[in-house]
UniProtKB/Swiss-Prot annotation:
Might be involved in pSAM2 replication control. The keyword Signal does not apply. It comes from Streptomyces ambofaciens. The keyword Cytoplasm does not apply. InterPro entries: Biofilm_reg_signaling, GGDEF_dom, Nucleotide_cyclase, Rev_trsase/Diguanyl_cyclase. This is Uncharacterized 19.3 kDa protein in repSA 5'region. Keywords: Plasmid. Pfam families: GGDEF. Residues 55-183 form the GGDEF domain.
């Protein structure tokens, strides 16, 4: 290759590599590396789209009950197994009806196009099934807060998350291991 052609192609090659690296970094910033679910940043754009396009949309906030105890008793690898199992169950439950994400720690979130099209009891049941880790059945339980976006004065994601959060804490206060709609 002559020097003139190399001088022309080298910057283009550099920009192509930079673009590829940038694309991979952006994608990894939008996916949780442990669970494979969307991160808050990746989930938010999808949830905003969902609640503005679907009048029967709902936002669910899921928090694992007694996760710290599980982590302290069985170790962090067991805690990771519980998070991965929860993510898989939540993602399977959402299916084509919505999108799931991990907010951080042991908090998960979903945006569902139509809550009436899915079985909330099936989610609660799935979240309370033990998961196997290293030959041990780890007990899992979760509290779920539900906000039907149509019941909000203005359909805003921040308000839906706040209402789902309040409902989730009400479910925790009631007895844990359950779901509760926003009031």
């Amino acid at each position: 290759m002559d020097p003139q052609t190399a001088a022309t192609l080298l910057p283009l090659l550099g920009w192509a590599l930079h673009g590829s690296v940038l694309t991979r970094r952006l994608a990894s910033a939008r996916r949780d590396p442990l669970t494979g679910l969307h991160t808050r940043a990746g989930w938010t754009a999808r949830a905003e789209h969902c609640i503005h396009r679907h009048p029967r949309a709902a936002v669910l906030l899921v928090d694992l009950d007694h996760f710290k105890t599980l982590n302290d008793t069985h170790g962090h690898a067991a805690g990771d197994a519980a998070l991965i199992a929860t993510a898989h169950r939540l993602s399977s439950w959402c299916g084509r009806h919505g999108t799931a994400g991990r907010l951080g720690g042991d908090e998960f979130v979903t945006a569902i196009r139509d809550l009436d099209a899915v079985d909330l009891d099936a989610l609660t049941t799935a979240l309370h099934q033990p998961t196997n880790y290293d030959g041990t059945a780890l007990p899992l339980a979760a509290s779920v807060g539900v906000c039907r976006v149509a019941e909000l004065p203005v359909p805003a994601l921040t308000d839906a998350l706040a209402a789902a959060d309040a409902a989730m804490y009400a479910a925790k206060g009631r007895s844990r291991r359950g779901s509760r709609p926003a009031r």
